[in-house]
Regions:
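A "functional boundary" signal
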Residues: 1-170
Length: 170
């Protein structure tokens, strides 16, 4: 999925009659399909009906990784729809599910998106804290690109606050 998201999407779309899938298979399918659409930057991710199936299925189950991932993508869909409040709640719920897992990259992404929402609300201190948490998670995941993006986000906050000396550190 991370390396060849276009191939993953193609394979998922070739599954005959996905509407006949039930239970875990259906939840896994819609979670993977939403993830593939996101990684391919498709506008079709703006519909929340599919990912909501996965959120509802995993919310009471024992798979915190899939529950966290479903909540994260639900947050992204809500963000695309302009519903910042539901997006924030979904990201926070995703972090709550993921906190006892080793899904550090996904945790880092959740912190980053929370930071973006906070920055949009002019809550710069909160956004800075979120971005710093994101750096920590990306470092634990050995995700160099994630660390770079998080540092960029930190620098932007310092720039907006006109703390130019701090901008140069990042």
């Amino acid at each position: 999925m991370d390396v060849y998201p276009d191939s993953a999407l193609l394979l998922l779309e070739q599954i005959p009659h996905p509407e006949k899938l039930r239970g875990k298979q259906r939840a896994d399918y819609v979670l993977l399909l939403t993830q593939a659409r996101d990684k391919n930057y498709l506008d079709s991710m703006q519909s929340d009906s599919l990912i909501k199936l996965a959120v509802d299925y995993y919310k009471n189950g024992g798979d915190n990784v899939k529950a966290g991932k479903a909540l994260f993508y639900y947050g992204k869909v809500m963000d695309l729809q302009g519903n910042d409040t539901l997006a924030m709640q979904a990201y926070l719920n995703a972090l709550a599910k993921l906190e006892k897992t080793e899904e550090y990259k996904l945790q880092g992404l959740a912190y980053e998106y929370i930071g973006i929402l906070n920055a949009d609300r002019k809550l710069h201190k909160d956004a800075l804290d979120n971005y710093q948490s994101s750096v920590y998670c990306f470092q634990k995941a050995a995700d160099t690109l994630g660390v770079i993006y998080a540092y960029r986000d930190i620098a932007r906050i310092y720039y907006v606050e006109q703390k130019y000396d701090s901008v140069y550190n990042y």
